[in-house]
Amino acid sequence: MSLRLSRPAVRGLGSAIKSSRISSRSAALLVPSTSTSAFSTASPQRAAAAGHLRLPDDYVPPTQPPSARPVDTRKSQLLRTYTSMLRSTPLMLIFQHNNLTAIEWAAIRRELSLALSNVPVPEGAPDITSKIHLQVVRTRIFDVALKTVEFFDPSTVEPTTATTATGTKVPATYNHDLSKHAWKAVKEATKNTEAVEKTVYGQLAPLLVGPVAILTLPSVSPAHLGAALSVLAPSPPAFPAPSRKKNPGYYDLTCQSGLQKLLLVGGRIEGKAFDYDGIKWVGGIENGIEGLRAQLVHMLQSAGMGLTSVLEGAGKSLWLTMESRRSVLEEEQNPKKEGEGEEEKKE
């Protein structure tokens, strides 16, 4: 004898299952599918309002732009992160490290944060201490990012066409760092070895060997740079290390062990390559940027005063020459007049 469930029975079973918690997949399969006609009871006003909600004609569906590299890998994301950091960071120091442990990195970052927090903030300037970071980078990917920033200009990419939701063609520019234009620009630029060696990348490329760490500053602040050098690469008397009495944690064995494995090899400041001496010069600017501006103003004023004195000296010398010539001519004429005057007196 076969059991057959009528439609009302099935509906009743479905409502019973909906009201209770479904604990198995077989019970879930017993729930009948809901008809789409149940959702067609919207009011005419809502339908009219929905008709006005339409996409603009120039809307391009969000699709992945064409790329020369796989975009879903960690290497691609690191490349885009490094290129963005290179374009937005005006001051960057490059270090080579030798197998520092996590505890040593933590100790070094602790002392670095302490030294940076003691730097006085100029009046009216933001505090950049919390935005100064010391991080380890992937050397090979960072090298590619540096080449991309150096040899690829996104503004030179000509726009192409993209299909909108309505099927029309609109101009679109694919100039991201993973695009084929970036790959071709880097490939063409690196063919000429002699030209590459004269660029900033050619000067920094020999430093990107082995494990690399970078210190990034969001602005060119000689005061913060000097504080960082006193911790990471001290060189007295310009950048002496903190005293043991003032900062005993700096002389902790873990911190000192990590600092011995850290070597400053160069830097990139305002898009230019700097060696160790150049970095020390920037960090030694007195009173920071304001002091540099004062030196520049003084130099310009001195040059202007020198030019004014030179021009005035030429005019004065010409005037003295003319005056001396006039006096000579007067003396040549005055003796005759004096002789005539004496004769008149004798008469």
UniProtKB/Swiss-Prot annotation:
What are the UniProt keywords, alphabetically?
Answer: Mitochondrion
Write out the annotated subcellular location: Mitochondrion
The Gene Ontology biological process terms listed for this entry are: translation
Q: Does the keyword Mitochondrion apply?
A: yes
- Recorded coiled-coil stretches: none
Entries under SUPFAM superfamilies matching the protein: Ribosomal protein L10-like
Q: Where are the transmembrane segments?
A: none
Listed under GO cellular component are:
mitochondrial large ribosomal subunit
Annotated region Disordered: where? 55-74, 325-347
> Record keywords: Mitochondrion included?
yes
Q: What is its main location?
A: mitochondrion
A molecular function annotated in GO for this UniProt entry is: structural constituent of ribosome
Note the InterPro entries from the entry.
Ribosomal_uL10-like_sf (IPR043141), Ribosomal_uL10_bac_type (IPR047865)
Q: What does this protein do?
A: Component of the mitochondrial ribosome (mitoribosome), a dedicated translation machinery responsible for the synthesis of mitochondrial genome-encoded proteins, including at least some of the essential transmembrane subunits of the mitochondrial respiratory chain. The mitoribosomes are attached to the mitochondrial inner membrane and translation products are cotranslationally integrated into the membrane.
Q: Which family does it belong to?
A: Belongs to the universal ribosomal protein uL10 family.
Q: How does it assemble?
A: Component of the mitochondrial large ribosomal subunit (mt-LSU). Mature N.crassa 74S mitochondrial ribosomes consist of a small (37S) and a large (54S) subunit. The 37S small subunit contains a 16S ribosomal RNA (16S mt-rRNA) and 32 different proteins. The 54S large subunit contains a 23S rRNA (23S mt-rRNA) and 42 different proteins.
Query: What is this protein's name?
Result: Large ribosomal subunit protein uL10m
Organism, scientific name: Neurospora crassa (strain ATCC 24698 / 74-OR23-1A / CBS 708.71 / DSM 1257 / FGSC 987)
| Lineage of the organism | Eukaryota, Fungi, Dikarya, Ascomycota, Pezizomycotina
